[in-house]
Amino acid sequence: IRLKGVCAPQRMLFSNGFFAGCLMPEAKGFGLEGPLDKCFAGWSRADLAQLAVTILKTIGSLHRFNVLVGDVNLSNIRVVSPDEAYLIDCDSVQVANLPCPVGHEMYTAPEIRGRDFSTFLRSKSSENHAVAALIFMLLMPDEDLDESGKYRLGARRISSDPFLLDYPGFHRGEPLTLCRRARIWSHLPDDLKSAFGRTFDSRGNLHAEADRLGVAGWILRLNAYRERLLDGTLLADDPLANEIYPKTGRKILPPARPACVVR
């Protein structure tokens, strides 16, 4: 596999006739597996949306060759800039009839959760769920989730049922303490909230295996999100919309009063 942004094995190495390992392209940049406050210093939310698109385009290029990443997760990504990122640990991707033997429960689609990944081939639809979880985690960078994929606040998974956060058409009926991740969520536009909610909530029309958004669908939504940040559309109603770590939840601004014309 020789694709831009993919650090996959290029050559096998042998020692005294025994397989010793593989050579792979060097991945530059910083990792996304830890606290990201310092990593994203100076970044805007528009930059974060562009990074998500960059990563999705790389995943999409693999899909076009019928290759699935399999072990989709933030720790397998290194970042140089919003326009340059690398998928690493690509020696475990699913190719032809060779399954990806590893995975993280946090990103795993409900229909394959708890199974031995080495015993079956994932579907692209299952990968689409992982992609949605990846984008959710990237747009909502925080440590409110532990390694098992559970909220420290509420102890529930992102893709638990019901989904923890309000989205258009569904309200939990009980307030969620406004932790940093919930504050970030409040500043996302409704179309993105809806896409995430309808994917992770079993009542949503994007939850079923056959109905999930693919890479192209997420790219379309993220590009629109970025454009509305850059042209000021979202900032007109929400001055903190472009902040990666807003200090407060979104405040609904009153409609602008029409100018008074004196005749």
What do these predicted ranges mean?
Residues 200-231:
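Terminal C-lobe "cap" of eukaryotic-type protein kinase domains
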Residues 75-115:
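Activation segment/activation loop of eukaryotic-type protein kinase catalytic domains
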Residues 4-51:
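Conserved structural core of kinase catalytic domains
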Residues 219-223, 227-263:
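Regulatory extensions appended to serine/threonine kinase catalytic cores
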